[in-house]
């Protein structure tokens, strides 16, 4: 069936749009389209057109930019982990810009730096909206199929990921939406073109839910603080219109969220943990200025609890998360009540700073900057004038 689909795909692509319309008029494949006006252009979402076996899929159109966003989840939770296994992919294809990879190898290369950073930007607002105790593998994949320089595909992938996940049966406390704001000559530009994004004084990306802003990423020249705040509020307001649009799609084609095996820490487990290791003992374990000593203390606390819960497999499975939450509550109490951090610093006190220069011979310049227990080494090398 897959081979036949590929053959038909090549056939129809050769004959252009006229054959495509006949193909869909025959009723072979039905899908739904949704449209909204966004920053003076039409945002179109095709649901059910492709990827029928994914938990959720949306074919996004904005100008001539096209991005396929899918959300898939494993049927069973991954065993032996204490985190949510989410993977986000953003795939750039040369054909999307009408180009063919050059050189001897005509295949696509590895992910670019922009693709990796875009994947992270998609991940940041999405990850907190999944249940913390969800252990099924989830993959959000975004494939750029066509690029219009006036409509940035990164933005489309962010919105597409939210739509694909929201209409899927994967547990998700969304939707969320993303807007980009640029600024040229003091005027805001909503969802700017690639040239406006690069040449403007502001590069602001804001992700929101209905209730609040959940992610801000920005690069800018020097601009007034009130301008930045105004841009954030403007993006948040636009996000609300996108969220209303997503809600409409979910109401019509959204799937019922499936149930899952919760890996949350039982409330009674916390009470028992306090009997094994008292809050005062946990404070002593956490309160040290040496990170390695603190980690050894926490390991000792964990081992003590393992011995106490040796007969309870359910509690042992979530022990790592339970100890982390216990430690987190202890640190929070120390900061709010005693105004001290775990290493003894006051809340307004920075770590010790140190700087050295000329630490490496045979290079034109070198330096080492240390903050607390974290050193960073820098080197500078100037090429020979014959290589200029």
PLM features per residue range, with description:
Residues 270-356, 360:
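Noncatalytic alpha-helical scaffolds and linker/capping helices
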Residues 132-138, 173-175, 242-260, 292, ...:
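Flexible, glycine/charged-enriched surface loops at secondary-structure junctions
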Residues 379-388:
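Conserved small/polar residues in nucleotide/adenosyl-binding loops
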Residues 171-281:
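Mobile "lid/hinge" segments at catalytic clefts and subdomain interfaces of large enzymes
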Residues 31, 55, 83, 109-130, ...:
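Alpha/propeptide regions of enzymes that mature by internal proteolysis
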Residues 101-104, 123, 133-147, 215-217:
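Glycine- and acidic-rich phosphate- and metal-coordinating loops
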Residues 152-165, 169, 358-377:
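Conserved phosphate/anionic-ligand binding catalytic regions in large, soluble enzymes, centered on
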């Amino acid at each position: 069936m897959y081979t036949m689909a590929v053959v038909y795909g090549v056939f129809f692509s050769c004959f252009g749009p006229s054959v495509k319309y006949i193909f869909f008029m025959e009723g072979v494949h039905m899908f739904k389209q949704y449209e909204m006006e966004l920053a003076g252009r039409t945002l179109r979402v095709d649901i059910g057109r492709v990827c029928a076996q994914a938990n959720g899929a949306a074919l996004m159109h904005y100008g001539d930019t096209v991005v396929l966003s899918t959300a898939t989840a494993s049927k069973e939770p991954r065993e032996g982990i204490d985190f949510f296994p989410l993977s986000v992919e953003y795939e750039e294809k040369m054909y999307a810009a009408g180009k063919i990879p050059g050189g001897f190898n005509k295949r696509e290369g590895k992910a670019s730096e922009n693709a990796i950073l875009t994947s992270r930007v998609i991940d940041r607002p999405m990850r907190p909206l999944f249940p913390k105790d969800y252990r099924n593998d989830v993959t959000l994949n975004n494939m750029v199929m066509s690029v219009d320089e006036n409509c940035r595909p990164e933005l489309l992938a962010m919105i597409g990921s939210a739509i694909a996940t929201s209409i899927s049966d994967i547990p998700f406390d969304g939707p969320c939406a993303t807007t980009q704001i640029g600024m040229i000559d003091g005027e805001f530009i909503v969802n700017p073109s690639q040239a406006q994004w690069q040449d403007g004084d502001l590069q602001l990306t804001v992700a929101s839910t209905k209730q609040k802003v959940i992610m801000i990423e920005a690069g800018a020249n020097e601009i007034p603080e009130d301008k930045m705040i105004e841009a954030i509020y403007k993006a948040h307001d636009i996000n609300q219109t996108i969220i209303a649009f997503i809600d409409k799609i979910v109401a019509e084609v959204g799937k019922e969220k499936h149930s899952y095996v919760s890996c949350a820490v039982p409330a009674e487990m916390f009470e028992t943990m306090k009997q094994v290791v008292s809050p005062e003992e946990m404070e002593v374990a956490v309160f040290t200025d040496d990170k390695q000593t603190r980690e050894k203390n926490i390991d000792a606390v964990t081992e003590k609890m393992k011995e106490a819960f040796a007969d309870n497999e359910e509690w042992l499975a979530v022990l790592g998360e339970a100890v982390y939450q216990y430690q987190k509550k202890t640190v929070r109490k120390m900061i709010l009540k005693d105004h001290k951090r775990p290493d003894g610093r006051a809340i307004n006190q920075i770590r010790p700073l140190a700087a050295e220069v000329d630490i490496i011979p045979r290079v034109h310049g070198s330096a080492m900057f240390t903050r607390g227990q974290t050193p960073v080494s820098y080197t500078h090398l100037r090429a020979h004038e014959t290589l200029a």
